Swiss-Prot record:
One of its GO terms (biological process) is phototransduction, visible light. One of its GO terms (molecular function) is photoreceptor activity. It is found in: Membrane. This is Vertebrate ancient opsin. Phosphorylated on some or all of the serine and threonine residues present in the C-terminal region. The keyword Glycoprotein applies. Gene3D superfamilies: Rhodopsin 7-helix transmembrane proteins. It is a multi-pass membrane protein. Belongs to the G-protein coupled receptor 1 family. Opsin subfamily. It comes from Salmo salar (Atlantic salmon).
Length: 323
């Protein structure tokens, strides 16, 4: 298939000319072979996801700020995860809702770069936050350094690493190492997975190693060690003193699994189109993993509230005291 590559104000855009001839410029009009109702459905979906995410994650951050009992190293990391999810929805969710409501990326180049960078950056911050959470569980239960306890300053250093490291590996496309480009459906922006350029491929490979494989490897290692520890210690010896830690560990596992369920399809899709950039995919099919990944920002705070008795108790107390 004849493939046309277009650069619009620094944002690269690949399209199959046979399919998308009516609108070579993604900023001036929608894909004409898709009925308007497709974009209306996506706009409605993004409105619901964005609204729920903003409300839920703001509630988690507000509760942690209001109740001193929740200001613990573990909760600092979870609040950081909520902040990342909140910012993903505030930037990417809002822009995606507006562009789908219009049917094309009418906001122009600056918004494309903003959405592409923001969603990628905050998404990777969330991924690395889960990796730090898994390390916190490993540190607390396995005690690799003996009686050394994890304190607030240690959590702060971990979060500083998360934000700095994520920024280092998501900012390069803004300055020319790869690019943030309009997606096939024309209403969202993402890293340029479809590029044939070897230079761009070096970034994509580096990005996957540092922002997906490394944090996932850290999660697998920490929970592998954690399971070994729990198997060695009998239920009687673990006792009631360790019961809260086991509950928190289960909560973190559920959060990690839920996040991976949301983002793994998008990661797999990105690998496929990077390896086969000329592959033809229906725009709706190509967009599905990206839109599905945004649901991760909705269910993480729900898991946190319902599986953490301390948080649910404080929220219930706050609600009924106001009532």
């Amino acid at each position: 298939m004849d493939t046309l590559r277009i650069a619009v104000n620094g944002v690269s855009y690949n399209e199959a000319s046979e399919i998308y001839k009516p609108h070579a410029d993604p900023f001036t009009g929608p894909i004409t072979n898709l009925a308007p109702w497709n974009f209306a459905v996506l706009a409605t979906l993004m409105f619901v996801i964005t609204s729920l995410s903003l409300f839920e994650n703001f509630t988690v951050m507000l509760a942690t700020y209001k109740f001193k009992q929740l200001r613990q190293p573990l909760n600092y990391i979870i609040v950081n995860l909520s902040l990342a999810d909140f910012l993903v929805s505030l930037t990417g969710g809002t822009i995606s809702f507006l562009t789908n409501a219009r049917g094309y990326f009418f906001l122009g180049n600056w918004a494309c770069v903003l959405e592409g960078f923001a969603v990628t950056y905050f998404g990777i911050v969330a991924m690395w936050s889960l990796a730090v959470l898994s390390f916190e569980r490993y540190f607390v239960i396995c005690r690799p350094l003996g009686n050394v306890r994890l304190r607030g300053k240690h959590a702060a250093l971990g979060l500083l690493f998360v934000w700095t490291f994520s920024f280092i590996w998501t900012i390069p496309p803004v300055f020319g190492w790869c690019s943030y480009t309009v997606s096939k459906i024309g209403t969202t922006c993402e890293p340029n997975w479809y590029s044939n350029n070897i230079w761009n491929h070096t970034y994509i490979i580096t990005f996957f190693v540092t922002c997906f494989i490394m944090p996932l490897g850290m999660i697998i290692y920490c929970y592998g060690k954690l399971l070994q520890k729990l198997r060695k210690v009998s239920h009687d010896r673990l006792g009631n003193a360790k019961k809260p830690e086991r509950q928190v560990s289960r909560m973190v596992v559920v959060m990690i699994v839920a996040y991976l369920v949301g983002w793994t399809p998008y990661a797999a899709f990105s690998i496929i189109v990077t390896a086969c950039p000329t592959i033809y995919l229906d725009p709706r099919l190509a967009a599905a993993p990206a839109f599905f990944s945004k649901t991760a920002a909705v269910y993480n705070p729900v898991i946190y509230v319902f599986m953490n008795k301390q948080v649910s108790t404080q929220l219930n107390w706050g609600f009924w005291s106001r009532a």
